[in-house]
Amino acid sequence: MAAVERLTIATRASRLALWQAEHVRDLLRARYPACSVELLTLTTRGDQILDRTLSKVGGKGLFVKELETALLDGRADLAVHSLKDVPVDLHAPFELSCVLERADPRDAFVSNDYGSLADLPPGAAVGTSSLRRESQIRARYPHLVVKPLRGNLDTRLGKLDNGDYAAIVLAAAGLERLGLAARIRALLEPADSLPAAGQGALGIEILQGRADVRAMLAPLGDAATLACVTAERAVSRMLGGSCQVPLAAYARIDGDELALRALVAAPDGRRIVRAERRGPRDQAQAIGESAARDLLADGADAILAELLPTSPAP
């Protein structure tokens, strides 16, 4: 296979997205010094619509379409995504070629005045961008007011600093990647705020026909992270996972096994269905599918029927 002399990485324009793309660029440059690696910065529809929640405007696919168009028309060879933003069903001619080692998958509590969610007084406003976080906060702290929070990371922090919220809840990985870990007042353990499928991981998308790019990316992948996110995304896929569904799935490697936890919640947090499964890490897909079936059998089907036009059958 002929050596690739030039690679172009498609990325969103936010500071966090650029950090992620630059990280992949630096890894590729270090491994393939003879290859020129550059960035193509694009603005996605998801970046432009900031006055409505993702669940009301089309979901996660809004952050990838423009990058996929760049792959199709040859302007880019690969696209770097936060994996939690990548739809679980990538249709031809696209493929998720590589998953890098995961950063911290947890959610982070950020506030200028309070140390934790438990410290917030009744009626305090908490900002979050996802139904998943909202439902879990409402379940544990029904006295708090959860409000939508959109925009890039700097915009969200700015809204907190302007007094729009008493606290906000964000992905810890994004804060840490941008050197903002000092803003974190508390990390929310999975038992308290189960992460989204793929949270903290970076995924690289290419065209299925680009075997040359796939071969170059292979050494960048992390097998343990791939197993975990495969199980998590299997849960989401079977349940029609989208921004319209308060769905969480988090897997970790425990010795030779993969341990998975998943939940589906009603947006108001009054109903939460949970499932746990474990097994050999090479059975990640099956473990995720089994957990999804457990959720459906235990009542998630009723929640999904209220949220989705056509909900999955157990």
Swiss-Prot record:
Q: Which GO terms describe its molecular function?
A: hydroxymethylbilane synthase activity
Q: Which Gene3D superfamilies match?
A: Periplasmic binding protein-like II, Porphobilinogen deaminase, C-terminal domain
Q: One biological process GO term for this chain?
A: protoporphyrinogen IX biosynthetic process
Q: In the Enzyme Commission scheme, what number(s) does this protein have?
A: 2.5.1.61
Name the cofactor(s): dipyrromethane
Homology family? Belongs to the HMBS family.
Name this polypeptide is given: Porphobilinogen deaminase
Q: Top-down, what is the taxonomic lineage of the species of origin?
A: Bacteria, Pseudomonadati, Pseudomonadota, Betaproteobacteria, Burkholderiales
